[in-house]
Every structure is written in structure tokens, then in C-alpha cells.
Amino acid sequence: TVFKGVDKSLAMELYKHCRKKSQITILYNSPRNGQKEFQIITDKVEFSNGKLYLYGTGLDYKQYTYFPVGRILKVLSVSLKKSEVEDIKTYKVGYELSSNSASARLCDEETIKEIKDDNTVVVEYVSSNLFMIKQKILSYGSSCKVLYPEFVKDEILQTLNSMKAGYLNGKA
């Protein structure tokens, strides 16, 4: 079931906060660091890869972020006044998708910039969370080619090379 490990009343509470774009403090059970508090200006609750996530602007790292709802223990507080979030660095990444990725779903931060004659589409993804951008690009596999910026191309290639090395080392 998709709600496995998810407190349904907590999920509904988070959904209501998202409708109001509330600023809340959550208690999160991190797999690496244990329980930790995070402040977030809520945006949406949405399914991705069969799991329910809370999305919003995290005030700790000043970037758009997401948390698996199953790891959120509770909402600790709701701020009456939202913090002004300034100096959020955003990344603009362009990539080309081939027709093999016809089932691709674009998120709110992605825009189609060009539809080419060879059945490819140029997409631009703008977000403050570079990890989310890279994760999305890698999910397309060989149907996707990063166009810009150069440092993202390099990081994607580095990730793919380390994945390849991991597979090759496993076969030794």
C-alpha cells in the first residue's frame, strides 16, 4: 500500500499546510542523523516513485527541498508570520530529451524551450536544489543529454563514471 509507514492524519495535516503555504517546523527522522528539526515553507504533498513527499522551501539550507512523509514524525510548530527567504541561489539547467522518453512528466520547475524536427525536446529546469535536477536528469538515462551549464555536464558524467566503476568492480 502507498501509505505504508505514513501517518494518515499527519499527511492530511501537511496537505492543509501546503494549501495555505504555511511555514512549519517538522521533526524528521533522518536515516543518517536521527531526529532533527527542520523549518520549511510548505508547497505541496505529492507522490513520487510510489512514496509520499512533502515539498517546500527549506529555511535551513535556503533551497527547495523534499522530505518523505513516512520519516516526518510530527509538526512541531506553525509560524504565524512567514520568514522572508532571500539569497536563494537557483540553477538553470538545459537538457535535451529524445523521443524514447515519451512518458516523461515535467514538473512545475521545468519548461519546454524548443521542439526539434528530430523528435527531441529541449527542456530547461530552474531550481534551487541541484540534487533534484541531477536526480531527474539521471532518471532519463540515455534518453537525456545535458546541454548547459558545463559544470552540471561534468558532474553528471562523474556520477555515471562512478556508477560504471561500481558495476565493473563488482564483476572482478
Task: Describe these PLM feature segments.
Residues 87-172:
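Polybasic (Lys/Arg-rich)
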Residues 1-25, 29:
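Bulky hydrophobic/aromatic content
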Residues 34-39, 62-64:
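Short, mixed charged/polar active-site loops
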Residues 26-28, 56, 125:
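Short beta-strand segments that buttress and anchor functional surface loops
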Residues 28-33, 58-61, 97-99:
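Short acidic, glycine-rich loop/turn motifs
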